[in-house]
Swiss-Prot record:
CDD domains: Ig (cd00096), IgI_2_Follistatin_like (cd05736), KAZAL_FS (cd00104). It comes from the Eukaryota. Residues 1-22 form the signal peptide. Ca(2+) binds at D187, D189, N191, H193, E198. The keyword Calcium applies. This is Follistatin-related protein 4. One of its GO terms (molecular function) is brain-derived neurotrophic factor binding. Glycans are attached at N318. Pfam families: Ig_3, Kazal_2. The keyword Transmembrane does not apply. It comes from Homo sapiens (Human).
Amino acid sequence: MKPGGFWLHLTLLGASLPAALGWMDPGTSRGPDVGVGESQAEEPRSFEVTRREGLSSHNELLASCGKKFCSRGSRCVLSRKTGEPECQCLEACRPSYVPVCGSDGRFYENHCKLHRAACLLGKRITVIHSKDCFLKGDTCTMAGYARLKNVLLALQTRLQPLQEGDSRQDPASQKRLLVESLFRDLDADGNGHLSSSELAQHVLKKQDLDEDLLGCSPGDLLRFDDYNSDSSLTLREFYMAFQVVQLSLAPEDRVSVTTVTVGLSTVLTCAVHGDLRPPIIWKRNGLTLNFLDLEDINDFGEDDSLYITKVTTIHMGNYTCHASGHEQLFQTHVLQVNVPPVIRVYPESQAQEPGVAASLRCHAEGIPMPRITWLKNGVDVSTQMSKQLSLLANGSELHISSVRYEDTGAYTCIAKNEVGVDEDISSLFIEDSARKTLANILWREEGLSVGNMFYVFSDDGIIVIHPVDCEIQRHLKPTEKIFMSYEEICPQREKNATQPCQWVSAVNVRNRYIYVAQPALSRVLVVDIQAQKVLQSIGVDPLPAKLSYDKSHDQVWVLSWGDVHKSRPSLQVITEASTGQSQHLIRTPFAGVDDFFIPPTNLIINHIRFGFIFNKSDPAVHKVDLETMMPLKTIGLHHHGCVPQAMAHTHLGGYFFIQCRQDSPASAARQLLVDSVTDSVLGPNGDVTGTPHTSPDGRFIVSAAADSPWLHVQEITVRGEIQTLYDLQINSGISDLAFQRSFTESNQYNIYAALHTEPDLLFLELSTGKVGMLKNLKEPPAGPAQPWGGTHRIMRDSGLFGQYLLTPARESLFLINGRQNTLRCEVSGIKGGTTVVWVGEV
């Protein structure tokens, strides 16, 4: 080496030695745990600013920082304001993975990042030789991450307040401007991407924080919201992280009406649009559907549409959709369900003598309401109208005032609406008495002798009453024998002692058999309607108190109390009930049953899958599978403090109405609403109280109680909405009520209600609210109630086409003519007739 070159190298070494010593002061000297790569990463960056400022600045920095000692994670720089040397936290560390645990409980990728974090936070963080933070993983939770983002926006608002013009914008636009401002501040190199190093530079100092961030830092933005996993955040991803979206919904799309035919599938698509739109949330009656495991709403598709696999009338109603986190902008979908007509005619066949009046009736149900037309032997009868022939109740009844031989024929009722048509035939034969055929004689004398009757279970056995003639057609005395066992119907406990029969509940099984409970004898009798005999007795658990027929599965459910204190209740099921003889008695697994409810069928809904059980003092209803007799789920009512007492159901909109037990004698028995689609409690049914009763077509809900002077009438619209028609105040509470089809207007109903303390009957026309009273009835049954419950004064109707109703008095029965709204007759000498069944055509 040349002598000059030697002295030059020596001079440079001497100039750089103080700077080198400045980085190795005792307070900052590196121990053996510091990687070589880290020191190399920190030192070159110490001169990053001075390189840009030229050689003179470089020499000045070397001279000034030579005596300035900076701790790890920082470097010496000249202050632009004062020109004096100062320590500044490192902007970044060279990427390397030598993980360590900090004394703050956090995990760091290397020592440099630990020291840099200590510098930025202004607190001491040392290396802990423990594996706890490795096992614990990242401590930043979703809750902490949400709090972090709120803090970032709050600090940004403090650092860069919105301008006057911006502050007048809506909150969503203000938030968008704030997030854009934060993004620009974080994007140090201005390339439109936030890297981990840029996010790491934005460390929140302790003095800026009003709340704990639960182990989160700005670097966690990459962990949670780097959707394309490219280790950087674009403005679009930054928008999504802070839920900044610009959503739109056209005014004409705010309410969308979708009409679908029952049994088909349908798709509801949300019209809320916008860049970066979050996932769509669907709700029904305020309950989120997306996360429920529903049988018929189970696929939301790639475009977040709502897919209903098989639409039924319970699905009708309102559905709303909105982008997650933006509930203020929502679309309402009104789902209307159309149902093709279903009709019944009455009678299917009749024979009349010339000169008498004849009526042919047709009942049709469907959505929209079907239109009815009549054909006689294929010809439209509307072209043959005369004084003799007329159409009543919007065409639902064809009336011939005086029949002639030429009126003989097949009369076809046709019901039609927008989605279908149905028809059935009612035949009319005109023959004088001398020309009666054997078939007509049998139809008149045999068929009518067992069908279209009230079967009354009284103190003196079983009494069959024909309402047209007001006569007792058949009387099965208590001493008559049971066909299969030869026991007496009502055995006497002591000789020469007359003891009344005791009945509590009876059901009609397909107009073939009547099942009736005898609580004191712990058995159920099976009455053969055609043979007019008691066929057999079925022994059940002690004190059977309630029977219910599940037509869909041909089962009779029997609730027994065990004793009068209901201390050992049980629920049994008699299968194959319509066979009359080959039944099986099955014990269900349910314990502590206080009551149960099986929804009724109707023309549109002919299959019921589920029933409901109430347990004593339990604020819940338990849903059971009627086929397997196994529990499915529990619908809790404890949030509403409701112990269920009674239930009703309408298939229109799928509502269950639950009557709660009274909290005190002075309080009213309020009601709750349950949605059968989601099995969720919707809340109180307004101010409605009392026991709910649903009309046969599911359109009207009438609520009343024996201890309340109020009667509430509600209607379900074709859109599945519950509307209160009116509330009536009456002088006495309602003991029981029955629905009667209107004879003046098709698809309308009236009710007849037995007053609790007065002998009168209340008549109400549901469509108009017109009220009347039927007087001159005798006092209702008196005395203490039976130990197994039940009302003293019942009301029983006579089926879909019947015009008669029955209610008991103390020692007689009263028959009401619903067509004429008058008292038909009184049948005397019948005591204890509070268990009654109507039997239609046999």
